[in-house]
Amino acid sequence: MRPAQTNQFDYVKIGLASPERIRQWGERTLPNGQVVGEVTKPETINYRTLKPEMDGLFCERIFGPKDWECHCGKYKESVIEVLSVSAVVLEVTESRVRRHRMGYIKLAAPVAHVGYSKAFLAIFHSVGYALRDVEQIVYFNSYVVLSPGNAETLTYKQLLSEDQWLEIEDQIYSEDSLLQGVEVGIGAEALLRLLADINLEQEAESLREEIGNAKGQKRAKLIKRLRVIDNFIATGSKPEWMVMAVIPVIPPDLRPMVQLDGGRFATSDLNDLYRRVINRNNRLARLQEILAPEIIVRNEKRMLQEAVDALIDNGRRGRTVVGANNRPLKSLSDIIEGKQGRFRQNLLGKRVDYSGRSVIVVGPKLKIHQCGLPREMAIELFQPFVINRLIRSGMVIHQAAPMISRNDPSVWDVLEEVIEGHPVMLNRAPTLHRLGIQSFEPILVEGRAIQLHPLVCPAFNADFDGDQMAVHVPLSLESQAEARLLMLASNNILSPATGKPIITPSQDMVLGAYYLTAENPGATKGAGKYFSSLEDVIMAFQQEQIDLHAYIYVRFDGEIESDQPDTEPVKVTENEDGTRTLLYKFRRVRQDAKGNVLSQYIYTTPGRVIYNNAIQEALAS
């Protein structure tokens, strides 16, 4: 038994890594005292033995061996010790370490990180470098003055062309030269020197003074630059770390090489990009050893810079590196960024159990807190609950499971019991606000489409032209309670963004409300008739004795509201029995001698009576 490793951490922090930190990631000391970690060879595996090459991109000494087996295969099983076998010293341990052990490449010349182009501009704001100027230095097109010495024509950080530098060089090396202390550099080494000379506190102070006097767009740019420098100071990062002297090599199991059926190998694009870097780095180191001409060394440094650029972000600058079939190779940035990247695809978009997905169709007969769940989907999602209920009824699991697979009729009754009061959550991508995922009470329906109440569509931004939605089943009692109390559609009527109702009548509801309450002078059937109650009106309409839009009188002794003032009677009639009848625009009132209301008939249409009745029933329920 091996002790379980518990890696506890509070948070993940992304920042600049120093060369020492990168070296620490990859360096390990074997139990015999040997320090390993540097990848020096571009080879991956030996084509004859099919074993990883030592000090190569898949080296077992650097990244760890196959499961409990040494390089030559002599020692196997759980031998946790260092073995010197076939002149190869390695640690026999589990292969899982090949997923997290890193290596590093020590560069023969520093290279600039292509991802920090804009950060370079923020650091060099006082000089007024443009992005093109920084690139000219890095890619060996322009020289930069590192120290002007006693030359009056030169200034610190001034850019020089090839011709200008040759002219100054002639002056420096002439016999009667008076120039002293002049230093000029080119490439990432010059950039490294400039960055190392920067005092961040002074830069921040001068920026704050400039911001006080600046206005408009210039002020906004200065604030952006100050924010970058303040972040450097706050995190303790140094600007020179943006120029790399050491490159990390990610674990081999994250850039695998797989043998195909025909004996050929399929490999990750990263291996090709790493191989280019190592080849160019080794070639540069050899050229420096043999003291090759400066122009050749400089060209090799530029090629190394381009190889590292392609590894970090292929195609961002210069020519895109392509593999077989002219396909661009996937760099480290391509793996991380975008919809198919590591974050959005694998970390934020994991597939989960107890979930399903289907097309949505309208369910007009559903209540707002209900959704139609296809039987086929429901039996799969609620299978553990169904089996549990069958076992509690006296069955054994070997009887219960086959009943579901053969669609036994008794299973559907159990499923009905199981889903009663068990909410499910519906989610429609993209989930842009919290109402993009809500819970509903499932109702079993035939077919294979999820039925959705039309009023919740605005919250999901859903329509029925082929949209799909995901279903998730909350398992624990706590999650079910939260789904019911917090996430139920009937509890989410107001928009969290504006506070206004997001569930509002739409489409056929608006049309129906308009049609019921509209006026139609052509509707004369039953017009002018009197009815003793609202129920009598509905009954007469159902028996086709009156038109939907015919104006009638119906007795209603309660209070009425109108959008038009109706307080002055149009006509008053005194009756023989001492009562009087007041005729208003929209009602007819009969009062006794003391002015008490004996009866009230309102002037309306059967459509409005039906509409009022529907609202009253909804409020009562």
From Swiss-Prot:
Keywords, alphabetical: DNA-directed RNA polymerase, Magnesium, Metal-binding, Nucleotidyltransferase, Transcription, Transferase
Cofactors demanded by this protein: Mg(2+)
Enzyme class name: transferase
Metal-binding recorded as keyword: yes
Reactions catalysed: RNA(n) + a ribonucleoside 5'-triphosphate = RNA(n+1) + diphosphate
GO molecular-function terms, A-Z: DNA binding; DNA-directed RNA polymerase activity; magnesium ion binding
A Pfam family matched in the record: RNA_pol_Rpb1_3
GO annotations of cellular component type: DNA-directed RNA polymerase complex
Residues passing through the membrane, by range: none
Keyword Nucleotide-binding found: no
Subunit-level organization: In cyanobacteria the RNAP catalytic core is composed of 2 alpha, 1 beta, 1 beta', 1 gamma and 1 omega subunit. When a sigma factor is associated with the core the holoenzyme is formed, which can initiate transcription.
Family: Belongs to the RNA polymerase beta' chain family. RpoC1 subfamily.
NCBIfam families tied to this protein: PRK02625.1, rpoC1_cyan
The protein, known as: DNA-directed RNA polymerase subunit gamma
